[in-house]
Amino acid sequence: MRSSAPMPRMSRRGRVTIGVLVGVFVLFTLLGWGVQAWTDWLWFGKVDYTEVFSGVLVTRLLLFVTVGLAMAVVVGGNLWLAHRLRPRLRPQSPEQATLERYRMLLSPRLGTWFAVVSVVVGLFAGLSAQSRWSQWLLFRNGGDFGVKDPEFGIDIGFYVFDLPFWRYLLGVAFTAVVLALIGALAVHYVFGGVRLQGVGDRMSNAARAHLSALVAVFVLLKAVAYVLDRRTMLLEYNDGANVYGAGYADINALLPAKEILAYISVVVAIAVLVFSNAWMRNLVWPGISLALLGVSAVAIGGIYPWAVQTFEVKPSARDKEARYIERSIEATRAAFNLGGVETRRYAASNLQPPASLATDTAVVPNARLLDPQLVSETYTQLQQVRGFYDFGPKLDIDRYAVEGKTQDYVVGVREINYGELTAQQSNWINRHTVYTHGYGLVAAPANRVVCGGQPYFVSGFLGDRSQEGCAAPTDQIPASQPRIYYGERMEAGDYAIVGKSNPDANPAEFDRPVGEGDDGAESYYTYTGSGGVEIGSFSRRLLYAIKEQESNFLLSEAVNENSKLLYVRNPRERVEKVAPFLTVDGDPYPAVIDGRVTWIIDGYTTAATYPYAERINLQTETTDELTNRGTFQQARENINYIRNSVKATVDAYDGTVTLYEFDDGDPVLRAWNKAFGGDLIKSKTEIPAELSAHFRYPADLFKVQRNVLTRFHVTSPGDFYSGQDFWQVPNVPDAPDSGQKQPPYYLFTQFPGQEEARFQLTAAVTPNRRQNLAALMSGSYVDGKPQLEVLELPEDTRISGPVQVHQQMTNNAQIRQQLNLLSSNQAQVQYGNLLSLPFGDGMLYVEPVYVKSNQQQAYPLLQKVLLSYGDGGSFVVLADNLADGIKQLVEQGEKAGAPSTPPPSGETPAPTPTPTPTPSSPSVTPPPVTGELADAAQRVQAAIVELRAAQESGDFERYGRALKALDEATAAFEQAAGPGSAATPTGSPSPGG
C-alpha cells in the first residue's frame, strides 16, 4: 500500500503572527471588559446599588463557568472516549489509506485539538448561559402565585419561575448530546471504529456501544421533552379558538399522545441499548425502534390531533372550544390585572346640550385645552431664554394644589439640548464642563390661556421676559433646587465633569441668565450634590479616558483633584441600570417633591409563561402617535403578564435613584427582591405622602390593558368566539389615514359614577371596523390603589367616535369657512387632543384649535375651541374660548326644545332638529342694504381687511384683536338685520383666505 505523504505544516513565522494577532485581540477584549466592569462597579457604588451589580455579575460568571465547563466536559470527554475506544487493527482499504493522512496530522497534537474543540464549544455554551441570568435567579428565588392552572392543578409559579429554566436546561442537554454524538462519530470514523467500505462489520463493538449509548440518552431526553411539552401546551396558541392555551383537540388528543410518546421514547431508548449491544449486536433493530418512534410521533402526535380538530372540533367549534375560551378569558384578565375592572352601562341617551353645562364645576371647567405635544414649541419659544435650552418634543401632565385648588398642569423641565450648542459652545470643555445642566420646572394650568393664546406660566421663570398679565407674578410651584443635571434629553455621550480645584476658584458651570435677551448677565455655579463618580486620581482619569476614548481626561486642566463625573444621566436609563429586571414605562414625568425636581418612572414586572393568558408584543401594543415623539419605544418583548410593581424616582439634581414597592401582592417582584438580598426595594409604606400625591396611572400599562380589553371585555365564550362585540382603538382623529393610534390622555375630571373629580388617564374605543363610540375607559388611583373603569355604551348608540366627531365638526360648512380664515399661506391650523367627556347622560366633545405661523421661530397659539354635544354632529360650535362655546351649546339646546332620547332598539329614530352652529364669520352674499345695516356691513368689511393684514403679518396679537373685531362686527350686523333676516355682509373672504 502506498504511504500517504504528511500534510504541509505552517511556517514558524506564520504561527507567531497568528499567535500575536490572537493575543492582541484577547488583550483588547479583556481590557474593554475590565474597564467596563470597573467603571460599572464605581457607578453602582455611587448610586448605592452594588448588590445588583455584584449579584448579576456573580450569577453570570457562575452560569458561564458551570454550563461552559459541563458542555466542554461532555463534548471533550466523548471525543477522548471515542479515541480511547479506537480499534488497534484496521483492515486495509482505499478508505483507510485516505484517512491515514488525517490520522498522521492529528495524532501528534490530538489532545490539543480535543482541548481546542472543547474550549470553543464550552465558550459558546457559557456565553449563551450567562445571558440566562434572569431565568436562573427567578428559578432560584421564585415562589407560588397562589393560583393553579385549570388543567393540571399546578401553581402558576411553576410556569413563570421554573418552566423557562427547565426548558433551557433541556435545550443545553440536547445540544451537548448532539455535539458529542457528532464528534464521537467523526473520531470513530477517522480512527477506524466506523467504516463505510470493506467487508464484515462496519462498526466496532466499542464504537457501537458508545454511539448507541449517546443515541439512547438523546431519546431519553426526548421523553423528558414530551413530559415538559404537556405543560407547555397551556402556553401555545389555539388556532381553533383564536386564543392562547390548550384547546379541545390539545387536551383530548395531543395531551394523551404526548404521554404515550414519552413512554414509547423510554422503550425505544432501552431497545437501542439492548439490540445494539446485548442482543443481535447490529443496527437493524435499533433503526427499526427509532423509525417506530418517528412514525408514532407523526401518527399519534400529529395525524390523530389533526383528525380530532378537523372532524370533531371544527363542525361545532363554538361549543367544543367554549370551556377553553373561558379559561383563556379568565387567565388573561388575571394576568393583565383586569379582574377588578368596574364596568358600567352608560346610555348616552341625551342628544341635546343640557343647561347644566353652564353651571358645572367638575367636568367643563377642567377640560384640558393645552395639548402637551403642541405647546412644547410654545414653551420652548417663550421660556427658552437661551438657544441651548429645550423642553423636548412633548410635555407632561401632572396635578398640583395651588391656593387650595387642585387641577392639572402642563409641566416641562428646561433642559440642556447639546444638539443646539453653537460651534464655539460645543468644544469639549464647554460641552462637558460649562454647559452641564438645565434650570427649572415650568408649569401652566392646562385649562387656561392668556395673551392671544399663550399658556399662563406659573413657575420656572428665568429673567424678565414675561409680559404683563401673561404669567403669574410669583412662582406658584417653587423649587428650592431647580437645577436639572439628570433629564430626558441626556444621551449616552452627554457626561458632565463638575467640581472646582479649590474653594477660591471661580465657578465654571453656566447656571442661568439673570437679565433679559441674549446679551443679559449670566450667573455661574459649582455642583455640590452627592451624585457623580470621583475622578480626581490619575488612575480614575486614565480609566475613564479609556472608557470614553477621550484624552482630555488626562490632558485638560478642567479635570482636577476634586472633579466628579456625572454619566448615565437619563432618568429612564438610570432606573433600567439599577433594576435590570424591570420594564420601564416610556413616559417619565417630573414633579416638584419637597422642593426638588424629581423624575417619577413606572416600573413593570412581566412574564411570558402565564398559562392560558393572551400573549402580546409590548412594543406593538404601546406604540401610538406619540411614540418616539416624546415617549420612548418599548422593546419587542412578548409578554402575557404585567404588573405596575414599582414606582421609581430619580432626583434631577444629584441623580439619586429610589425604588418603591407599589404592588405588594406581585410574586414576581417578591422573587426579584429576594434575589438581591431582600431590601433592594423600599416598602410601600415608606412612600412619602407628597410623592404619592403625584402618582398617576401609567401610560404604557393603560395602553396594554385597553388593547387587551378590546377583546377580553367579552366574558361569554360564545360571544367571544363570534367576535362580533370586539372593540378597536381609533386612529388619530385629525389624521385617521396615518394608521397611528389615538393616544390616551390625562384629565382632571369626573366620570359618571365617580364621587368627585380625579386625575385619570382616559381613552375612547369604537366597535370593530366601525367608527361610532363603543366605550370610554379610565385609569386612576382611588385611595392609593389602581382603579380601571369602563363606561360601555349600548350597541345601537348613535354617538359618534373620535374620528367621526372631528370630521363632522370640521366639515360643517360655516365652521369650515372659519377654519379656512385661520389658515392661509402664512399660517396653519393644528388640532389638540380631542377630549371625549361623558356629561349629563350625553357626550361632550372638546377639541382645541391652534394656529401656527409659517414664519421662523413661530409657535402654536390656542385661537379657537371646537365643541360638540350629543351624537357629534348636530350641536357644534367653534368659539373663541371654552366658556363662550359652552354658552353657545346651551343656547342651541334651548332652541332645539325638549331633550330627545333614542327610540327602543329596532325602531326608526325620529328626525332630530339640527340647529345651525353659531357663526363667527359671514358666508352668503346678501341683497343691497342701506342705513344702519349698511354701516354694520362696512364695519364687517373693514374687520375682514384687518384680519387679512394680520394674517400676512404673522402678528398673533394683532390677529386675535382682528378676530374679536370681526365677531363684534358680525354680531352688530345680525342685530341690525333683525330677527330672521338672512342678510349677511358682502365681501366675505374666500375659503382659501
Swiss-Prot record:
Residues 900-929 have a biased composition (Pro residues). It is found in: Cell membrane. GO terms for cellular component: extracellular region; plasma membrane. Residues 976-993 have a biased composition (Low complexity). Residues 892-937, 974-993 are annotated as: Disordered. The chain crosses the membrane at residues 18-38, 61-81, 110-130, 171-191, 209-229, 260-280, 283-303. Pfam families: UPF0182. Keywords: Cell membrane, Membrane, Transmembrane, Transmembrane helix. InterPro entries: UPF0182 (IPR005372). The keyword Transport does not apply. It is a multi-pass membrane protein. NCBIfam families: PRK00068.1. Belongs to the UPF0182 family. PANTHER family: UPF0182 PROTEIN SLL1060. This is UPF0182 protein Sare_4110. It comes from Salinispora arenicola (strain CNS-205). The lineage of its organism: Bacteria, Bacillati, Actinomycetota, Actinomycetes, Micromonosporales.
